[in-house]
């Protein structure tokens, strides 16, 4: 199931402003790769480039043997890129069940079901299946957003700040879920995060960004280095 995701020398502009400068990231198969940095350095723009929401002006993104530069978001999703956006973006008026079923869009009829392991990872989703998404707490909505992405059967799971504004107990649940997906499902995971302890605990590889550029990459243990942390201090 593991598939590599390779970002090679991409540039991205918003009008005349350059947001990303020659960004290169390799997400090795079956590993968790974390991208860190202060607010506004281009982390989320990088993820939106991967998913096709933002269009790059130079470089290439490859997913296994497929090149993605011209592929629209729906095609990337069908190839196996699952996305959990910042802010969760669940549908508040739909039930938990209906929110999960929105992940069916790109699936064949035979695959249109919610894999049992999603409810094992996030039992609250099963117990609140018929409740509206808007009734869930922020942490529960994040679990729902991750569950919805997993319904699409991704080979690579991309998450934008999955711990933002969430209580510590649910952060631990999310961390355990991502480790399960890596260790038991062989999933490749790319996440943007500012919570250093979370990344130190679950990430295999890190990339540190500043002003739209990669300043450092290496193992998660490098987060203890002073020259790395200087790019993360507010």
Task: Please state what every model-predicted region is.
Residues 36-38:
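The feature captures the beta-strand-to-loop junction immediately N-terminal to the Walker
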Residues 5-7, 20:
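Conserved structural motif at the start of ABC-family nucleotide-binding domains
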Residues 51:
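Helix-to-loop junction immediately C-terminal to a conserved catalytic motif
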Residues 132-136, 140:
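Conserved ABC ATPase signature
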Residues 59-67, 79, 111-114, 120:
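Conserved ABC transporter NBD signature motif
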Residues 172-186:
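Helical segment within the ABC ATPase nucleotide-binding domain
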Residues 149-150:
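ABC ATPase C-loop
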């Amino acid at each position: 199931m593991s598939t590599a995701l390779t970002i090679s020398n991409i540039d991205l502009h918003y009008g005349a402003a350059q947001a990303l400068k020659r960004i290169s990231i390799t997400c090795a198969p079956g590993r968790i790769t974390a991208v860190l940095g202060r607010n506004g350095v281009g982390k989320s723009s990088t993820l939106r480039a991967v998913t096709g929401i933002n269009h790059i002006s130079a470089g290439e993104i490859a997913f296994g043997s497929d090149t993605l530069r011209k592929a629209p978001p729906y095609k990337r999703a069908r190839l196996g890129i699952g996305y959990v956006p910042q802010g969760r973006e669940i549908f508040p008026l739909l039930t938990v069940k209906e929110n999960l079923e929105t992940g069916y869009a790109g699936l064949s009829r035979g695959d249109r079901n919610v894999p049992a392991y999603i409810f094992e990872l996030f039992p609250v989703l099963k117990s609140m299946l018929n409740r509206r998404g808007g009734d869930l707490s922020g942490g529960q909505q994040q679990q729902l957003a991750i569950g919805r992405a997993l319904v699409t059967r991704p080979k690579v799971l991309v998450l934008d700040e999955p711990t933002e504004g969430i209580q510590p107990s649910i952060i631990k649940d999310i961390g355990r879920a991502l480790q399960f997906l890596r260790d038991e499902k062989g999933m490749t995971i790319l996440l943007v995060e500012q919570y250093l302890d979370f990344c130190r605990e679950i990430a295999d590889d890190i990339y540190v960004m500043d002003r739209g550029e990669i300043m450092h990459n290496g193992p998660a243990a490098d987060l203890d280095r002073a020259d790395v942390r200087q790019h993360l201090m507010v």
